[in-house]
Amino acid sequence: MTDHSCIPELKVRYVQQIVPDMMRDFGYSTVMQVPKLLKIVLSMGLGEALANRKLLDASVADLGVISGQHAVKTRARKSIANFKLREGNEIGVMVTLRRSRMYEFLHRLINVALPRVKDFRGVSPXGFDGHGNYSMGITEQIIFPEIDFDKIERISGLNVNVVTSAQTDQEARTLLTKLGMPFRK
């Protein structure tokens, strides 16, 4: 048996248990047909950042601590006069996780952060996009234990997009359920 000390626990479980289970359940003929996680994108939209520049920097730091990877600022693509928004203004923060960091983040999200949500009954099963990807919103970044409650500028939410190679929502839901995602019944 090989040493899996540096490979994330979820990745090991995916290779050893989930792939054979899904090949049997869906009748795939090759391992390459089995859906897998491609990336996880975390993003925060900060419309208030136009007035308060410190908020954007604090959000970059928060997302960096949550993900373990440096976050980048996103810019407005179009000007919208009603929102006093100009093209090129920095109005959001995002980070894309792949490989080991992706599996480690998903493990922390499922086993540490989501159980800390007040009155948590599972994530919504209605977050699939029809092409095997799942999106969910988190209302407070303080559910992650890495965030120090005393040092945060403002409580804000973030979007979590899980991109898979699944062709259908059913395949993606099965994959995420086997990885431990607690869907509402």
UniProtKB/Swiss-Prot annotation:
Q: Does the keyword Iron-sulfur apply?
A: no
**Alphabetical list of Pfam families matching this protein:** Ribosomal_L5, Ribosomal_L5_C
Q: Which GO terms describe its cellular component?
A: ribonucleoprotein complex; ribosome
Keywords assigned by UniProt? Ribonucleoprotein, Ribosomal protein, RNA-binding, rRNA-binding, tRNA-binding
- State the superkingdom: Bacteria
Recorded GO molecular functions are: rRNA binding; structural constituent of ribosome; tRNA binding
One GO term under biological process is: translation
What exactly does this protein do?
A: This is one of the proteins that bind and probably mediate the attachment of the 5S RNA into the large ribosomal subunit, where it forms part of the central protuberance. In the 70S ribosome it contacts protein S13 of the 30S subunit (bridge B1b), connecting the 2 subunits; this bridge is implicated in subunit movement. Contacts the P site tRNA; the 5S rRNA and some of its associated proteins might help stabilize positioning of ribosome-bound tRNAs.
Give the record's family classification.
Answer: Belongs to the universal ribosomal protein uL5 family.
The record's note on quaternary structure and interaction partners says: Part of the 50S ribosomal subunit; part of the 5S rRNA/L5/L18/L25 subcomplex. Contacts the 5S rRNA and the P site tRNA. Forms a bridge to the 30S subunit in the 70S ribosome.
The entry's protein name is Large ribosomal subunit protein uL5
